[in-house]
Structures are given as structure tokens and as C-alpha cells.
Amino acid sequence: MFAIAILAAGKGTRMRSSYPKVLQQLAGRSLIKRVIKSCEDLKPDRFLVIVGHQAEAVQDHLKELSHLEYINQVPQKGTGHAIQQLLPVLDNFIGDLLVLNGDVPLLKAETLQKLIAKHKTSKASVTFLSARLSNPKGYGRVFSNNQDEVDRIVEDADCSREEKSNKLTNAGIYLFKWDLLKNILPKLSSTNKQSELYLTDAISQLPTAIHLEVDNIDEVSGVNDRAQLANCENLIQQSLRNHWMSKGVSFIDPESCTISEESQFGIDIVIEPQTHLRGNCFIGNNCRLGPSTYIEDSRLGENVNVMQSTLNNCQVASHVKIGPFAHLRPETNVSSNCRIGNFVEIKKSELGQGTKVNHLSYIGDSHVGCHVNIGAGTITANFDGFRKNETVIGDHTKTGANSVLIAPINIGNRVTVGAGSTLTKNVPDGSLAIERSKQNIKENWKTREETNQ
């Protein structure tokens, strides 16, 4: 049998955060979800998460993963103490236990497969990952022979000056034979500078220990503070950009752009500087995004041009131009061949094919037909102080500049709305709707300053 245990009980004090370290985000996904994803194909018989600090928050974050089991570690007295909590849970378990850290988010499934393969061929009591670091400060040192057989692991705080010169470090990823480990766990001692129970102390007490040195040390990079979090974010973003550039996406200034792992792209896409994609996005062929554009949870068809704009939870069809400085809010659906210009905000609305909203307008809770021209400064006044009301604008309708449509209202097909009109009543098809106050001109008018002279 095969079990996995993820250590996720720590406070992460160096992160200076109000929520658990394992819930920090990288490219839109938490550290712990990244760790879980790295081993989801291993198909364990038991999948355990050891929680402690803000345990409820961690469990709530993972609530959709019903196959996980949770074990509380209170208080937190080190990695050895964490695994001790498994003794009653795995009392009758026979097999291998893979121990992972919830704050090591870049680990690849292929590396874990290599670890498992070496463990099986060596028949060792424990096989673990190691990394050779140029600056090993803070990491436990691994002392082994040329056959990768490990004599001991010494934590950094307990290393002598000579031992600190060793650059081979413990990556904290272990594969144990559980029937051997469970007999050693109760014997662990906290006689060390940290006064904690180290899981590494169990290794020297096991019959055989083997280490596997990783090819890429970035995979075992831990996240303990904001600087390390930023470093991991940069590594992920670089990997994502390189992947999509190999698939036909151009980044004008790659390092200024960020994308989520859920984002998908077609080909011949150009992404300008300072463009950011979050959540589940799909970008069709021949699109051009940016510069200075933010897109979240949105789907864009082919040949869409978005410049200096924000899109959130939108559906945009093909051959649409958006921006600069447009804001498309959730539940906005834009049909093909539309034009949305500068300083336009659209919320929870549908725009029919070929419709233009070129400048300085707010369209909210509206159904706008095909080939409609929304004049500059047109506003759909959708909120009456109690509820949001709907505006319907028919096909081939034109609204003049500075029009206000007070919802609920239905403007028919082929309607012309005169500039400066404020409409409160429905307008039938083929009509001219105009509502203005009478223009009043007073000739020879003098200002107050002129009158006082």
C-alpha cells in the first residue's frame, strides 16, 4: 500500500500574514494545492494532510478535495512530532509513506516518480530528495558515501563549523517504509537547539537510507517569506511564458507580463507589456492584448484587440476592439464586430453584433441589439435606490450624445434618441425620441463682476 502525508501545520511567521503560509498564492493557485497537484497521479491509498495553525481555514480551502484526510498537530513541535500524529491513524497500515512539505510548490511529478523508482530498486528503509546549494544556510546537511547511502542529516542550527561547509542539503521530501518508521517515531528526542522533534533524526536510526539528488534545485525551493514567494512566482511565470511562446504566443516584454496556469491561448497572439491574465481565461487566434491590460476569467474569440483595459468574467466574440481605458465587468457578453472605446464601462449586459459604444458611456443591466450606435456620454440609469433595472435597446438604434435612459425602459428597433435627452418611457420602433428643456437666451447678459463695477 502507499500513503502520502503533507505537512501543513506551521504558522509561517516569517511570511507576516494573517492566514496560513500554505494558502499563499502562486500564479493563482495556493502552495498546498500545487503540492497536491504534483502527486495526484501517484494514486495513494491514503492521502493525509497534517494541519495545525488555522486548521479550519486550510480544510475549508481544500473542501472540494473529498479524498483528503486531516490530522491535527497541536501544538507544533517539529516535523518528527507531526509524523507522530499518524501513529494511531496508520496503526494497521503496511507500505510506503511519502512525506511532503506544504510549502514546496514547484516539485514535479516526474521527480517524485524517480524517487519512488529509486526507493523500490534500492529497497532502502527511507529514500529522500537532496539538493546541492551554493548557499545552504538554513538547510539540514546530508552526509553520505559515493553510493548515495546516508550516514546522517544534521540540521543547520546544530551543524559544527566544519559540517556547515557541506553543500549537500536535505530537501525534506521523504519516502519511508512505514513499518520501520513507526517503531522509531516514539523514540525521537527534542534534545537540540530548537527543542523540537526532527524527522531527520529517524533516518540515522533506520537500517538503510538513500538520497536522490535533484536535477533542478528550483523544484525543492521552500517558501518561508515574501522574498521566496516572489522568487517562486517568477520561476512559474517564466516557465508558463516559455511554454506558450513555444506554442505560438508572442510576448513583447515577457518579464512585465503574468498569466495564470488555467489560461489557454490560440496561435499568433501578441501580448504587449504590462498585461496580466488571471483565473480561467481563453484567448483565441490572432488576438492582441495590451499594453497595460488586465483580463480575468474571460473568453475572447479570434482577432480581438484589447488595449489598456480591464475585463472580468466576460465573453467576447471575434473581431472586437476594446479600449483604451474600457472596463468590462462580470456577465458582459459582446458579440462579433463590436467596438468598445475609451472610458466605457459595461456591466451585466449583452451587446449585439456590430454595435459600437465608442466613448464615455455606462451600460449596465442592458440588452443592446445589433448595429446599435451608442453616442458619447450615453448612460443607462439602472439603479433606483432599491434594485437594478433593465434597459433594452433594439437593433439599428442610435442614441445621441449625453443621453440618459432611465430603467426600466425599452427602446425599440431603428429608434433615434436625440442628443441630451433623458428618457423615462418606452419608445416604439422607428421613432425619434427627444426630450430637452427649452433653450433660453438672455442677450446682453452681465456677470456679477460686471454688475458690481
Curated annotation (Swiss-Prot):
Keyword line: Acyltransferase, Cell shape, Cell wall biogenesis/degradation, Cytoplasm, Magnesium, Metal-binding, Multifunctional enzyme, Nucleotidyltransferase, Peptidoglycan synthesis, Repeat, Transferase
Active site: 359 (proton acceptor)
Residues noted as binding Mg(2+) in the record, renumbered to the chain: 103, 224
Gene3D superfamilies in alphabetical order: Hexapeptide repeat proteins, Spore Coat Polysaccharide Biosynthesis Protein SpsA, Chain A
Cellular localisation: Cytoplasm
Pfam families per UniProt: Hexapep, NTP_transferase
Reaction(s) the record says it catalyses: alpha-D-glucosamine 1-phosphate + acetyl-CoA = N-acetyl-alpha-D-glucosamine 1-phosphate + CoA + H(+); N-acetyl-alpha-D-glucosamine 1-phosphate + UTP + H(+) = UDP-N-acetyl-alpha-D-glucosamine + diphosphate
GO biological process, one term: cell morphogenesis
Keyword Acyltransferase: yes
Keyword Metal-binding: yes
Recorded GO MF terms: glucosamine-1-phosphate N-acetyltransferase activity; magnesium ion binding; structural constituent of carboxysome shell; UDP-N-acetylglucosamine diphosphorylase activity
Linker: annotated segments: 227-247
Binding positions (UDP-N-acetyl-alpha-D-glucosamine): 7-10, 21, 73, 78-79, 140, 155, 170, 224, 329, 347, 362, 373
Pathway(s) per entry: Nucleotide-sugar biosynthesis; UDP-N-acetyl-alpha-D-glucosamine biosynthesis; N-acetyl-alpha-D-glucosamine 1-phosphate from alpha-D-glucosamine 6-phosphate (route II): step 2/2; Nucleotide-sugar biosynthesis; UDP-N-acetyl-alpha-D-glucosamine biosynthesis; UDP-N-acetyl-alpha-D-glucosamine from N-acetyl-alpha-D-glucosamine 1-phosphate: step 1/1; Bacterial outer membrane biogenesis; LPS lipid A biosynthesis
EC number(s) reported in the record: 2.7.7.23, 2.3.1.157
Stretch list, region N-acetyltransferase: 248-453
Region (Pyrophosphorylase): 1-226
Known function: Catalyzes the last two sequential reactions in the de novo biosynthetic pathway for UDP-N-acetylglucosamine (UDP-GlcNAc). The C-terminal domain catalyzes the transfer of acetyl group from acetyl coenzyme A to glucosamine-1-phosphate (GlcN-1-P) to produce N-acetylglucosamine-1-phosphate (GlcNAc-1-P), which is converted into UDP-GlcNAc by the transfer of uridine 5-monophosphate (from uridine 5-triphosphate), a reaction catalyzed by the N-terminal domain.
Protein family membership: In the N-terminal section; belongs to the N-acetylglucosamine-1-phosphate uridyltransferase family. In the C-terminal section; belongs to the transferase hexapeptide repeat family.
PANTHER family (UniProt xref): BIFUNCTIONAL PROTEIN GLMU, NUCLEOTIDYL TRANSFERASE
Entry protein name: Bifunctional protein GlmU
Organism: Prochlorococcus marinus (strain MIT 9211)
Gene of this entry: glmU
